[in-house]
Amino acid sequence: MEHIQGAWKTLSNGFGFKESVFEGSSCMSPTIVHQFGYQRRASDDGKLSDTSKTSSTMRVYLPNKQRTVVNVRSGMSLHDCLMKSLKVRGLQPECCAVFRLIQDPKGKLRLDWNTDAMSLVGAELQVDFLDHVPLTTHNFVRKTFLKLAFCDICQKFLLNAFRCQTCGYKFHEHCSTKVPTMCVDWSNIRQLLLFPNPNNIEGGSHTLPSLTMRRIGESVRIPVSSQQRYSTPHPFSFSTPSPVSECSLSQRQRSTSTPNVHMVSTTMAVDSRVIEDALRSHSESGSPNNLSPTGWSNAKAPAPTHREKAASSTGQEKNKIRARGQRDSSYYWEIIASEVMLSSRIGSGSFGTVYKGKWHGDVAVKILKVTDPTPEQLQAFRNEVAVLRKTRHVNILLFMGYMTKDNLAIVTQWCEGSSLYYHLHVLDTKFQMFQLIDIARQTAQGMDYLHAKNIIHRDMKSNNIFLHEGLTVKIGDFGLATVKTRWSGSQQVEQLTGSILWMAPEVIRMQDNNPFSFQSDVYSYGIVLYELMTGELPYSHIRDRDQIIFLVGRGGVVPDLSKLYKNCPKAMKRLVADSIKKLRDERPLFPQILSSIELLQHSLPKINRSALEPSLHRAAHTEDISSCALTSTRLPVF
């Protein structure tokens, strides 16, 4: 029991435990780990003089090849005298043993921490680690992090830094003073907590006291960058620790009483899941887990067969834990409905109603016309949101999130400008030809981007094209096939969607299971070009909606191209005619459309700046010269 207490208090110093987990007496294990002890030199023998006896001091050799001299006062125990020296080095007296060095015969005698310190004035003491403490030394290497990584000390970006090959601790060079002294052997800790060995028990059975999750939550502190590093067991090597001088960043060996600044221990991260799993297994078993000091030492050196088995299954365990810990990335794009404040209703369309709202600024909220969505619809909606959230383009409205509570809704950026439909058919804005061509180019550029992402708009029209901050085109209401289709049971059934004036003939006929395609978006874009180049809507002479559906679906009517502006370029007229062809396969795709409009823009005549200087400047220059000539003094001629 004492060994378990000492080990837990050791870990509490490194992991930031605010309160002691165990309460009891000090460790009294007869076993000692000699590899951590201070190696005395021959020159150190006989250095203790009579002055040290008269000054009431003791010389103490500490782990990690350090030493110090402590003052002794009357009434102080050995524990009280050495507490400060051990604390500044990140050590706990409960996990160490103290010995008195004997000169003749040469050896050492184990002392109790409660021994009166006055009886040891002038003596030489040695402090060693107990054998059940699962610690090892770091194995630092310099590493260039090509992938995104952060310092475990300051949480800042890493590029050229250091990393421990054993525990994975990574840090900047200027953060090395805060690196924990000892490397935590996580495989031993996990084996101790989860796989105790009840067969090797000496001196009776010892049980692990129960811990509440409240105390664990209060004591464990997990930095963000360390949550993944210790989330899976690591197959550490169990070789003898190398000397500290080889892994302390090339710092010279300290021989004075001042502690090595590169070895000062600080709060180290620990994954709470390790302790939670141990508590869960402890509570489910119904009987206490038996632990002993021998169990600690056995966990430190497992059998070769066990190590080979653990190494072979490490990949499978890592994949299982990672799969369990991952969360759907679309979860972070879902917005809580109570955080969005709706202000005014902007309008309604074929698939929903648009409101202006407030969510960290002005946003547009489109509440979709889907009542009581089924689990299949919700999953399909989330799948499409996962595609929409990856769209980033200057001519595309920025997708900001979605909502599923009460109603399905999407949140996009707010566009201050009006729609192209409002400019052309309500405000009757008079655009110049080069402005109309530029609007057509930006629209084609945005649609080309969507098609490159395999997103079909399905509702391309002038109402969904917005002029933002001047003449910057923003395309909205794209994608969302889930809400633009009719559901029959758990299957999607295509239905007549969109405004009929911009619908392609094959979409109106609905003869195919999925009539929507890149070419159907091209047809809708062709109608938008017709609006730009005429300032009118197509089929204005037909008043009956059903008649338009019948005639367009059968191919009996096409937009009247004779109404195009007289100054419309011939290339633009051909592009409008090609985009609204009856046969789907005869229409061009947006890469071809975009290149055609860009060539047209370059061929348009431009007003070049005159190379002549302004006459005002020349007149002023001439006036200055003439004034100088008039004011010049003429010398008399003799």
Swiss-Prot record:
<keyword id="KW-0547">Nucleotide-binding</keyword>
<comment type="function">
    <text>Serine/threonine-protein kinase that acts as a regulatory link between the membrane-associated Ras GTPases and the MAPK/ERK cascade, and this critical regulatory link functions as a switch determining cell fate decisions. RAF1 activation initiates a mitogen-activated protein kinase (MAPK) cascade that comprises a sequential phosphorylation of the dual-specific MAPK kinases (MAP2K1/MEK1 and MAP2K2/MEK2) and the extracellular signal-regulated kinases (MAPK3/ERK1 and MAPK1/ERK2).</text>
</comment>
<feature type="active site" description="Proton acceptor">
    <location>
        <position position="459"/>
    </location>
</feature>
<dbReference type="Pfam" id="PF02196">
    <property type="entry name" value="RBD"/>
</dbReference>
<keyword id="KW-0808">Transferase</keyword>
<dbReference type="InterPro" id="IPR001245">
    <property type="entry name" value="Ser-Thr/Tyr_kinase_cat_dom"/>
</dbReference>
<keyword id="KW-0656">Proto-oncogene</keyword>
<dbReference type="GO" id="GO:0004709">
    <property type="term" value="F:MAP kinase kinase kinase activity"/>
</dbReference>
<dbReference type="GO" id="GO:0005739">
    <property type="term" value="C:mitochondrion"/>
</dbReference>
<feature type="modified residue" description="Phosphoserine">
    <location>
        <position position="329"/>
    </location>
</feature>
<keyword id="KW-0479">Metal-binding</keyword>
<feature type="modified residue" description="Phosphoserine">
    <location>
        <position position="257"/>
    </location>
</feature>
<feature type="binding site">
    <location>
        <position position="167"/>
    </location>
    <ligand>
        <name>Zn(2+) 1</name>
    </ligand>
</feature>
<keyword id="KW-1003">Cell membrane</keyword>
<dbReference type="InterPro" id="IPR046349">
    <property type="entry name" value="C1-like_sf"/>
</dbReference>
<feature type="binding site">
    <location>
        <begin position="346"/>
        <end position="354"/>
    </location>
    <ligand>
        <name>ATP</name>
    </ligand>
</feature>
<keyword id="KW-0472">Membrane</keyword>
<feature type="binding site">
    <location>
        <position position="366"/>
    </location>
    <ligand>
        <name>ATP</name>
    </ligand>
</feature>
<feature type="domain" description="RBD">
    <location>
        <begin position="56"/>
        <end position="130"/>
    </location>
</feature>
<feature type="modified residue" description="Phosphoserine">
    <location>
        <position position="43"/>
    </location>
</feature>
<feature type="binding site">
    <location>
        <position position="151"/>
    </location>
    <ligand>
        <name>Zn(2+) 2</name>
    </ligand>
</feature>
<keyword id="KW-0067">ATP-binding</keyword>
<dbReference type="Pfam" id="PF07714">
    <property type="entry name" value="PK_Tyr_Ser-Thr"/>
</dbReference>
<dbReference type="InterPro" id="IPR003116">
    <property type="entry name" value="RBD_dom"/>
</dbReference>
<dbReference type="GO" id="GO:0005886">
    <property type="term" value="C:plasma membrane"/>
</dbReference>
<keyword id="KW-0963">Cytoplasm</keyword>
<keyword id="KW-0863">Zinc-finger</keyword>
<feature type="binding site">
    <location>
        <position position="154"/>
    </location>
    <ligand>
        <name>Zn(2+) 2</name>
    </ligand>
</feature>
<dbReference type="GO" id="GO:0005737">
    <property type="term" value="C:cytoplasm"/>
</dbReference>
<dbReference type="Pfam" id="PF00130">
    <property type="entry name" value="C1_1"/>
</dbReference>
<dbReference type="GO" id="GO:0005524">
    <property type="term" value="F:ATP binding"/>
</dbReference>
<dbReference type="GO" id="GO:0000165">
    <property type="term" value="P:MAPK cascade"/>
</dbReference>
<feature type="zinc finger region" description="Phorbol-ester/DAG-type">
    <location>
        <begin position="137"/>
        <end position="183"/>
    </location>
</feature>
<feature type="region of interest" description="Disordered">
    <location>
        <begin position="279"/>
        <end position="323"/>
    </location>
</feature>
<feature type="binding site">
    <location>
        <position position="183"/>
    </location>
    <ligand>
        <name>Zn(2+) 1</name>
    </ligand>
</feature>
<keyword id="KW-0418">Kinase</keyword>
<keyword id="KW-0723">Serine/threonine-protein kinase</keyword>
<dbReference type="InterPro" id="IPR002219">
    <property type="entry name" value="PE/DAG-bd"/>
</dbReference>
<dbReference type="GO" id="GO:0008270">
    <property type="term" value="F:zinc ion binding"/>
</dbReference>
<feature type="binding site">
    <location>
        <position position="138"/>
    </location>
    <ligand>
        <name>Zn(2+) 1</name>
    </ligand>
</feature>
<feature type="binding site">
    <location>
        <position position="172"/>
    </location>
    <ligand>
        <name>Zn(2+) 2</name>
    </ligand>
</feature>
<keyword id="KW-0862">Zinc</keyword>
